[in-house]
């Protein structure tokens, strides 16, 4: 008769077999967080306008200013303050006018200002401007802004700028800064600060 089966022995492990074929691609993962926004020439124009308004409040507190909007509307009064307060707020978005008694009047969106003219004053050479951003703004808006400044360089006489269906500035180009042109009358009178992002029709 056959005897009992003996204990199973463990042999030496054989060599590793070849790698199998690559499996199917897994599903696409979740979209990552949105990166930081690139430079916008529109923001640069607003920053330059805010910078100038802050200085107008300091240098021309008793003078009347005329603010032309991109829509064609106008507002006038004395320069009051930037809002939200204080005037040094780097994120201020409104410019508030006052009447002759210093009582606050309408608040104006800085993002919609085409120009601001100081009708009864002389240009103050102490006014300073923000430099062009680094890295430079890109895109269609930057192309238009650069073309406007190129078309109306400093010293251009009999220049006129139209926005919102009205002439918002005319005279001689005194300054050409990033996001802004300054036009003046005889002897640097009645300076007008124009956003190059809002200028529409240019003549010279």
Please state what every model-predicted region is.
Residues 30-78, 82-170, 174-204:
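Short glycine-rich, low-complexity segments
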Residues 1-44:
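Collagen/collagen-like triple-helix sequence repeat recognition
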